[in-house]
Amino acid sequence: MVRSLSPALTTVLNGLTRVPSLALTIEDHVLHYAPYQSPGSADAWNDACLAEDGSLVRVQVTRGGFGFTSNLQVQRITDPTQAVQWSAWTTLPGAAGLIFEDGSCAISNSAGMLRAFAQRGTGGNDLWAWTSLDNGVSWTGPVSVVSPPGGALIKGIGSAGNHDVFFLYDVLGGEAMGCCFYSGGSWSALTAWSLPPIAGGAGVAAVFASALYTLIYSDGYSLFTCGFNPAGSVWSAGPVIASSTSSAIGRVSPRLSQANGLYTLTCIEYDTGTLTGSVYSYPRLRQSADLQHWSEGLILHDLPSTYGAVAVSWPAPPAGSAGARAYVLTLPTIYSASLFQASNPAQYLDASASVLSYTRLEQSGKPARLEVLLDNTQGRYNALVTPVNAAGGYQPIGLNASLVLSEGYCTGSPLTPTVVKVGTYRLAQIQFVRAPEANYLRLVAFDLSRNLDLVARYQQIYAGQTLGYLIAEIAARAGLFTIVLPTTSQIAQIVPMFVLQAGQTYRHALDELCSIYGLVYFLDQDETLQVRELASSDPSVWSYQPEIETISFGSTDQRANHVIVSGKPPIGPSSAALTTGEAFDDAHMRLIGLERLLHHVDPKLSTTVQCAQKASFLLAQQARAQVVHSVTVPLNPALQLFDGLTLSDSAAPTGSGQSSLCRILSLRAHYDARHGLNEMQMELEGL
């Protein structure tokens, strides 16, 4: 998918002379969570939200005593730098000694109206609500929302901030979910879900998006999702975020927040050591762009918690000097990290003027690699590098910081730098290099698809999902949330069973899925995972003739011309029955006078049509691999992996007179100011 260039830049690329231009910025977007405040409050069920004035309002159900005589308390913070605000709690009116401590609690902001929820534990089992119209300064209530039927106890409360409340409550056989809505000055009757009961209840979180509710809830060990359409009060089961086949690992108190287009799901993950011998209890933060596919996330092992943590992005507190920060809130301890701001010199650095040389390498099935040499004369960058294992004092040049590279040429008159972003890379290596004649900084970085080489912590089993769903799922598990899938019919094909194994890399799983129908993928400059189905009808996006510096036209004959694909055997009386599909290259057989057979087995294919489709894709790949070209041309920022090219060499006597339609299989862009190099070397296969 060729990058778009301005008309001026296209004109320069088609010219005979060019003046290279580039831009390189280093940006630290990493959330360096660290202890921020230590109020020391006893751990308990809790929740938090931002009020309209930018203040942070928290609630907790205190613990201790009988269990049905707890308090619901509230806290309002306007200046997060003030420790006293984190330790001050006020009991809400009518909530002293009357709250069920294990019913959990919730708080939400419904268009400026704050509501806090908890279950009455003494004198009734009402779900109570308190209201604040002044950003949490004062509160009224409680009012009864609903009394769960049969005197049931609540096992988790959540609110999406849409004048709503959702909760898990006891029913025969386990727990059910219900909801109520506020309208016209009163709460609606209970709407109970139509799904089967779950074995236990350990928290629920709610979000309202695109006129639908998504609920994430826990039975104590697994994290489930379901949907609710308020238009027809329709419930629907959703995907399982984290499944459990035993009671070894617990997951409780899910909480949701949203910032910068991503949802963050926080839950407490714990192990009592009964089965594994390992004992821990800490928050895990998962992320998602669509509430369907979630990353494995990040653990905060050094932030122990039992009853819940809340992740909040707080860009503008109404008072104090904290600035834009992200927080993970527990009652005993507050963790925080600075949000990225380009105006912060500790997070942003323009290193364009110091680039001595760079090489970027892109190839199929591997993360793109960038190696940069920066001029470090007089130690200009010495103090801007974060030391390895630093616990604070972060600088822009640090491990996992982003290197954003743009390439182009000077255009117009007078000459003006015109560049196009070609990649975003995560810093993996930092080296200071000193010699009598040199002083430079060597940076090596890889694009975000390197996350695909991480290993899965837990096994996940998927049954009856489409290929497109599974590709998006594996990508999200690795932290790749933006994905573009082809619109061909293969993406909608059902994969009967797929297992993401614990200890397996996500790339292994993604490659296995893509191999079903011959798909390829790469990460573009905006960190979008581009998944493509290659076809011989793909257009040529660029033509080369006079610009060619060196070229090699080649071909190889070591390839198959008859492909047989066997899938899952059909169910029937015959034990010898097979599910197969075949593809033939008759022209190649006639050319070489040989049948070269490739036999491929894929049990994920269940029909002869699917087997025939895969056979045709494998045969097409064999035909593409027969073409082996390489070319060196002036650096072209428009080109990406798998783009189609037209190559036409000069006629005799200066050239070979060869021409070809081909596809980029790998590319190496090299810039070296000291040696006057600005070129691109490409390895090509057939289109």
Label each PLM-derived region with a short phrase.
Residues 32-341:
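Extracellular, repeat-based ectodomains that mediate carbohydrate processing or recognition
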Residues 89, 129, 142, 190-192, ...:
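Well-ordered beta-strand positions in beta-sheet-rich domains
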Residues 335, 413-419, 431-556:
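Charged- and aromatic-enriched interaction segments used to assemble
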